[in-house]
């Protein structure tokens, strides 16, 4: 066991920095550096075996790289590197990011011709000669290294101008990526380029834009990046690299984003295939389009062929209606089999319905690996939230960690939508200060735009997780304080549902699996439904309420499918409370014959198998409520399914007082009203009965108010001069209401519930004979 504990986990090794030339970016004393220089501490220079003024190649993100000259700076911390603002922009990095540094051993070619484009918005207001004022002073350093495609900024007394290097030609008239500028370099200025075009190039998706799936990204990078970059690893060890990877998971979890990020970071050619683009009404043309896509990818290798929604392009042939779909599946199989082992082409497929794909595709040699890109957990969601808010102006009161705790079940696209809605709400708040007909917006208004916590609160209330949009999802606003009495039941529910969500580490410590379900049983009107809603609210879980008949369907197999889909959606939105009201309608004791109850029996079997944990439940809690527990199938009530059987009895005296206080907490009451006296007069009344008494009393007060006002109108009195005739609820209203009150639960029914509750208890006295234990199983 000790050896197993000390084993190193290599599953995410590809994500770790493994070389001494990895440095942390900082901006210490950047004012002492020129555009083409980087600052390093002398000890770091020694470690890397570098001298001052050596040329180094620095790798940033998304395949960005630049050549710099080194400068020794004591102020830069060891293992850090100071890079000027333009350099950080070109490398797509920020302060505290890491970069890799390599010595440039060969000479950098001298640039004979240099073409550049000024960025339009930086030269619009410049009146002087741009070349003389900005470009010539900038290029006045001998052997200054530049990189094609990079943006450089020059500041003078007239302002700041930025330009993009578009082309560099060496002495042999060849285009080069890196080169050094000298006094002999010919410089050509072309037309201007817009800021939008520049940002479009620099805003490519990279690994840093993908969050919430660290383990999956490690697997994908192993399977895609290694064969594309270092195929010799596979040939040396004597195995073939993978040909295809299938990414599956709910919509909006980042499958397409991952494919684009890998293509950009590896520099691979990305060929995107969408089903409708391949399909053609002409016979044989669809297969031809598919062949052309693979041929194009092989010509541009290393390449990634990304087939989005592959289930539409390659469905199961035995279930496919059209001949075209069958031929396309066959063609895809042939093309994947015909791919050369080391052709530097990888096929990525994405789907949210993996079981709809033809099984012939899902074998080794075709789609070798299947990786689930699921709904992110709490850590993943926070990572994604930080990605979506990294460029957002936010006020100091925004606490992303606290916001994240309320976003159970949100996918990456849901979180993007949430951030967008929060920003939009901030703009709405500023609209009264904005003249929409004016060409420009006041600079003060623009400067005051900051997304605050209230904007996020609004966005949370108006954004639902996409996995639950098909289901009628409720966000109950019922708290423990809204439910009178039942203190022992509330504590039991906290331990069963709330604790596994809030304190999962405690369950791991004691090696215990949390309970899967709770059954509320008892007389009608005692607060079973209300308790389920309070549980969901208090543990900030999603809440899905299901009525039995909603799941029934006239088609064979459809009812069971509805239950499967329901649990799948609940798992996607975990932690989630599934509340089956009147569960006896779909979980009656099985009859054992093939009569009309066959559909109900099949539904019960499906419900049992879902609750048995055949599929991992991921904090999905099932709460059933019934007032006919004797009719439920006994298999449903065993441990491992509905673990906790909670009897919700008629309220006792203290509980009745609490219920009356909760019901009347927003009602103005006369000081003469004694709720305890009212509770004593309503023995054996359920919570619903007490609520009805209070409602009827309030109706009487409202009736009295309206009748008085109508009477005064007839007399011609002014309404403004009238005093409120009924300022609060009086004792006589309650007395009048009590005269028509009735109990909804008879003595006979109460006895039946209590007999059932006794039958489900264990006689603890047989186990512990040393102590006196009362009938409730408590020590006296």
UniProtKB/Swiss-Prot annotation:
This is Cell division control protein 48. PROSITE patterns: AAA. It is found in: Endoplasmic reticulum. GO terms for biological process: autophagosome maturation; mitotic spindle disassembly; retrograde protein transport, ER to cytosol. Involved in spindle disassembly, degradation of ubiquitinated proteins and protein export from the endoplasmic reticulum to the cytoplasm. Acts as a chaperone that collects ubiquitinated substrates. Has a role in the endoplasmic reticulum-associated degradation (ERAD) pathway. Component of the ribosome quality control complex (RQC), a ribosome-associated complex that mediates ubiquitination and extraction of incompletely synthesized nascent chains for proteasomal degradation. CDC48 may provide the mechanical force that dislodges the polyubiquitinated nascent peptides from the exit channel. It comes from Encephalitozoon cuniculi (strain GB-M1) (Microsporidian parasite). Keywords: ATP-binding, Cell cycle, Endoplasmic reticulum, Nucleotide-binding, Protein transport, Repeat, Transport. GO terms for cellular component: cytosol; nucleus; VCP-NPL4-UFD1 AAA ATPase complex. Belongs to the AAA ATPase family. ATP binds at residues 251-257, 352, 388. It comes from the Eukaryota. Component of the ribosome quality control complex (RQC), composed of the E3 ubiquitin ligase LTN1, RQC1 and RQC2, as well as CDC48 and its ubiquitin-binding cofactors. RQC forms a stable complex with 60S ribosomal subunits. Its main location: endoplasmic reticulum. InterPro entries: AAA+_ATPase (IPR003593), AAA_ATPase_domain (IPR050168), AAA_lid_3 (IPR041569), Asp_de-COase-like_dom_sf (IPR009010), ATPase_AAA_core (IPR003959), ATPase_AAA_CS (IPR003960), CDC48_domain_2-like_sf (IPR029067), CDC4_N-term_subdom (IPR003338). Disulfide bonds: none annotated. One of its GO terms (molecular function) is ATP hydrolysis activity. Signal peptide: none annotated. The gene is CDC48.
